[in-house]
């Protein structure tokens, strides 16, 4: 939302936004849309592949490997669900042991094959916490016993039993008849005994259901009519869409969390690696799109009360933000990411176009018409030129062949008299508008790391302008002329050089880069092997080698590096320094000096 809408919706995770009209429900409505997607094990095809013999051979091998992986996952998933429905007492006790802890995966470790599944423990824990109502027909008795401190269970359990099942007691309203029968014979000695009572009655219903399935050769949901009302109620505790055991099967990388035992993890990773390697390195493998896929069953979002994931509130259907004026922008169907993207990009949305053109303006002028590119809320500064912002936004979404064309916005800005101004100071203007908010001159902007590196490569004549291809490690390779756009970045451990030049942390969104002036930046340009190599390769250019004399060579260096001819004084200083040097050391130092000038590193 910050990137396209200029809104900090994340502030509404725990409570309604304190400044902007964004309720908590809007945050979780968007969360539900995004949570309904997963990262697939194998990215989808970028486009339909050509039907070649090479591709057909690839597809045959791919189908075999995908089927082996699919069969293995389905087998393990079925075993996991069966385990959750057969070891009910063990999972209930594990969830009981974590009842005062938030349901997070911090405790998840690799387990042995026969251990209970940590993911399923979490699901049982969340499920029980969702059914804490005093009138819950199945679990109300469980929660009355679970509220007794462990050390006092033997002393206080009889009183709890008496209040529900003894003479004069009042059972929880609408308590399931079968649960009542399993618990009413006498007070339990421990929570383990309560868990076993629940497990026993649930297994009885499960056994009855399996008899129906076997007798009808695969019963459909309508066959639940063969169970009585109390049996159907308990059947849903194991088979309902929100039941703890009804863990959805999603073929994404999240599968690893479902199977934490060592053997399954190793085998699953092995098979996944085989599919991935075949899809990337085999001849005939088509390009794939790095994107998410929609879940078959959309995620039903619920409000986290005060942002606490184990205190769930009301259900929230997927929808777009309701703060925008005019008719609400609805998400059609089940609220997919595609519908969300359309709601963001529609011309009915007054924010998107303004946020986009403001970001473009920021890149050209160093400061946006709105100075906070990612915050158009009530706390942001008003635009310096609101009419101009509206004009550019209208042009972006104007009807016609260039509707939505970013190139048209670039063209408008670049051909304007405002952009084509020099960055020369004027005393009267500076006194009236020292921050240049009225744009009486062009702002002088320092090159960021990527354009600075590309400019250094361009001076050598060896900048590689090819488009596409794999990333390259530009920080360790001895020499690589590829544009900095294709540089590899370790998201978890960014290189110190990048942070030195204010490249933001790639893990988090950054509205605008900071600009620092520190000693390591100058030392890099002075001493780093890359910049010395740039100077050497610049001097080795054929046109410089063919220059008739030092004066012509200096003039050509000025043209290559600074885009102009040297002034008479600059030329004389250069000739005085270089003298009649026949070796390249002075020339190397001179080229490095030009590369270190502000004129090279700044855009006027």
Predicted regions and their residues:
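Active-site-proximal helix/loop microenvironment
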Residues: 519
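Sequence context surrounding c-type heme c attachment/ligation sites in exported
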Residues: 1-60, 64, 494, 498, ...
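Short, functional "switch" segments adjacent to catalytic/cofactor/reactive centers
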Residues: 41-185, 193-247, 251-367, 481-498
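Primarily short, surface-exposed interaction patches in extracytoplasmic proteins
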Residues: 1, 21, 222-481, 498, ...
